[in-house]
């Protein structure tokens, strides 16, 4: 078992792809909230939360998970990534609102409209990996 968990909610598959890519690069465990919602966080020092956005809001499964685990998350290093279609200020506002609602200060967005890496994901994912890599 690793000391990093990536917990995500994905609708069309982009958040899942990003989660799996990050996990492969840093050696993290992944949990898809469509399949598993009861996750023992006590094994992990770092939690990376991932979600897509619909109508400006994060996917409900992740919101429910954060609400249910708010106390356990306080003792962890928590990061949030949001997969979205926007760039620039609109994306910054969107991720800022989501992070604020969750009480998370370490948050980034990955735009589907940004430059891609070799895995056809936003190059910003690689920058994020360097930031969270143990």
Language model segments and positions:
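Conserved SAM/SAH-binding loop
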Residues: 33-36
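Glycine-rich NAD(P) Rossmann-fold beta1-alpha1 loop
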Residues: 10-16
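FMN-binding flavodoxin-like domain, especially the glycine-rich phosphate-binding loop
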Residues: 2-5, 16-17, 21-31, 43, ...
